[in-house]
Amino acid sequence: MVEFSLPRGTMDFLPEEKAQRRYVEEIVRKTFESFGFQEIETPIFEEFALLAARSGEEIREGMFTFVADGVEYGLRPEMTAAVCRMIVTGKLNMPKPYKFYYIGPCFRYEEPQASRYRQFWQAGIELVGSSSPAADAEVITVGAKTLENAGVTGYILKVGNIGIFRGILEDAGFDTEDQNRIIGNIDSIMSTRDKCQLIAEKAKMEVEDESYIKTYLSMLYDMQMQLISQGVQSSFGEYEVLPSALEKIPQWAEKLPKALEETYRAIWIADGVPEETADLLLRVSRIGGPRSEVMPQAKELLTGTAVEKSLEDLDEVLTYLEAFGVTNYEVVLGVARGLDFYTGTVFEFDFPLLGAQKQVCGGGRYDKLVEEFGGQSTPATGYAFGFDRVVQSRQLVKDIPVPGKVDVFIATVDGSLDRKAIEISQNLREKGYKAEIEMTGRDLKGQLGYASEIARYAVILGPKELKEGKVMLKNLKTEEQTPVLVDELSDALG
């Protein structure tokens, strides 16, 4: 007989898990809608040409693709491209700014990891048509309120502005393509710093940590050897990765971020970046902390028209953010985000209890993206939650109530009362309660045992009580039983 198994990198959700997810989903929807965002839905697959419009053919390696009717399609890896398609096609007969939200599955073709699946869910918002710093602040606020409403406390919010790096590189004469490449390197440096800090905080290094460091050491060895062979740099000193490095993994956990910095610095200089510019980029990437400390430090360090404008924008966004009541944040100038379409404000929400996959949300301003998809120049800002990680984060927080599955189970002393059970259950459903009746012929003890697993209350029907127009209401948490008039049952349930 053929054995069937779950596709790699996917998940089944049993009733209790699905109840948790639906509960969080409703919180997400209500929070988004409270800020005026309206839900949209797009196909789970798009023409591959659309999905590759910005990233090029190389995106194919990380996607599920197929051909139908002579057209190549791809399962969507994210939702923003579809939103841009909707805008560019001119079918939106509504005033700006557009305020959309979406919740749905996305797909990536890569090796599955812990908390990183091939099918995953995103919940996000897009605010299109406003260049105001207040729009950035509102988008960030929606993220903060969503996590708080979902019971995810203890998150870390990092806010920066990628325009600072773009301004430094622009003043040095580098075009957008070179900027994107170097900013991508900075993003890699930042993520390595975070990862190695997590590893250092552990009492014992895990197998996946060793694998991570080995992978980076092998990559650094190849990069450094190429630079040395080309005569770009003769040595990297204590940060030079030798073949013996793989035998000294624990020692490299602390040195790896600096080694990566030195290697990228050498590459940048080889590509024409002035030494002082390379050093400035790395110095800026290390600046982070409270607004009162970071902004004066940044304004003293950074000069240049483009850079100063980005700092002013960041300061204004933070002012609006505090007006929204969001004060628990860090200003981190090194937040670069891995995607090259960001143009200004960038931000991330981390939940440390998730470990290596701690980021639950990320986003920022992308004023040129709609234009790059063929539309008119349109300012925009937005973000996406990793919905699965939000649910997981919520479950890691203590004292979070589990959403109930059923409000009430109708139990009967014997089968002669089944019709009455149906009548009562229907009346309760019409009043908005989730009600279930006995379907398997169990005795009363069996029914109550089942009810305790799936419901908050049990309503027990007995011939004697029904003659008096009453039923027995049992609180399945406290075990307390109370006689209640049938006509007052819904009031007693609260």
Residue ranges with predicted function:
Residues 59-70, 174-199, 351:
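Acidic, His- and aromatic-enriched active-site or binding-groove loops in soluble protein domains
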Residues 1-17, 67, 207:
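Auxiliary tRNA-acceptor-end handling modules of aminoacyl-tRNA synthetases
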Residues 38-44:
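A short beta-strand-loop structural module common to alpha/beta enzyme folds
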Residues 17-35, 46-49, 80-92, 100-153, ...:
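Positively charged, Gly/Ser-enriched RNA/tRNA-binding surfaces
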Residues 157, 161-165:
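Glycine-rich, mobile lid/loop segments that gate access to catalytic sites or pores
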Residues 44-73, 116:
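Polyanion/phosphate-binding surface patch
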Residues 74-79:
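Hydrophobic alpha-helical transmembrane segments in multi-pass integral membrane proteins
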